Amino acid sequence: FNIHNFIAKEAVPVAIVMMIIGLNYASILTFLKPFAEQRHLLEASSYFFIFYAVASLITRPIAGRMIDAKNENVVVYPAFLALIITFVLLVFSYNGWVLLLAGVFLGIGYGNLSSSMQAIAIKVSPSSKYGIATSTYFIGLDIGIGFGPSLLGLFTDSITYTQVYLIMAIVAALCTVLYLIVHGRKVHGNTY
């Protein structure tokens, strides 16, 4: 057994960023329904992930071309901003259209972060480790999405869903800074 057969050390920083992004996403997967029930937005919430999927489907090909033409930062920073806006919109969603707009921003934010971070994990790794780098990326994502509901559930007795989403906006902002530190500041010009 050798850990390097399962983890690409070059991709670990990006996997950690993705773990935190996964935690953000898990908060929506876990709490959207009870949050929407509290706000009387249950019907609109049933369309939330359709709006997410359409926004992601439209923006991912554009983001891919932007990364190829420039570099990953031209997509990653706006995607982080979109993720932050997602949570701000959720906090202020008292009608269905605002909730659905949050779904659009989630598609732009999380949808593009997930594909961009996977590309970065591969980019920073030697070609002999592309498969392991992809695995490392998904380990980070799976930890965030898998343990996120349990971790966040520890606090839902003492804070509201609105407060959870406000905290997630702050976490997304801090994750942007973490990305800057572990990768973003190293990117200059066209890197592809």
Regions flagged by a language model, labelled:
Residues 74-89, 169:
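Structural signature of the two symmetry-related core transmembrane helices
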Residues 59-71, 156-157:
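Helix-to-loop junctions at the C-terminal end of transmembrane segments
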